[in-house]
């Protein structure tokens, strides 16, 4: 999933080599629209499907341990059909590029990972609240989640019908000659919404946080973060010294 303005010639060639369905948004309209474009195709093919959502630019190590965490989250979301399992990770410093999760009451444990209700989802721009949350044991919002496709669809239907109606119109056009034209028309009217602070916030009593355990999580959107992530796992970097 990407937006048209982010798609380079090299990137397009890379995605063509990867199996699966590669979707391009006409333009960026926030994280909710990006997720729901993919979700629309899932709902068309299998309305009872389980879905996992995660950004493509994260480094998580070791991969096998993360896969186990993600598998556990998916099992929980399958058993508790109306619940969304959002993954959080303990932060060692005051992050400014990510949102935060204020955990609430304990719901249980799974293989060493704490499952808790969520008291609040904090926007990354809310610095004062972030400082308070960090001191009180908040976790960084990875934006990685497991849920049934139907539960996310219902959240938008009940709380953001304008957005969902646009995707329903697009859903009806999938496979037809006017599919791309319908998508472009939908995005001309698409509201800019956040998956976390809009969609998930609207169903917060159905969202739990599962704290990632025994993994290193790092955002690799810039070279400095790549270097930091490699250093944590004891790997040398070939990046220029001026970046390191």
Residue ranges of model-derived segments:
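Conserved N-terminal catalytic core of the sugar/cofactor nucleotidyltransferase
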Residues: 1-53, 58-67, 71, 89
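A conserved hydrophobic position in a structured secondary element of the catalytic/binding core
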Residues: 2, 54, 122-125, 147, ...
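Structural motif
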Residues: 21, 50-52, 83-86, 143-144, ...
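A short acidic, often aromatic-flanked loop/helix-cap motif at beta-alpha or helix-coil junctions
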Residues: 28-33, 93-95, 126-128, 215-217
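Residue-level signal for inorganic ion chemistry
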Residues: 38, 57, 101, 148, ...
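A polyampholytic, Gly/Pro-enriched intrinsically disordered region
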Residues: 41-52, 106-112, 231-234
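Conserved core of the sugar-phosphate nucleotidyltransferase
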Residues: 63-185, 207
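Left-handed beta-helix
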Residues: 147-244
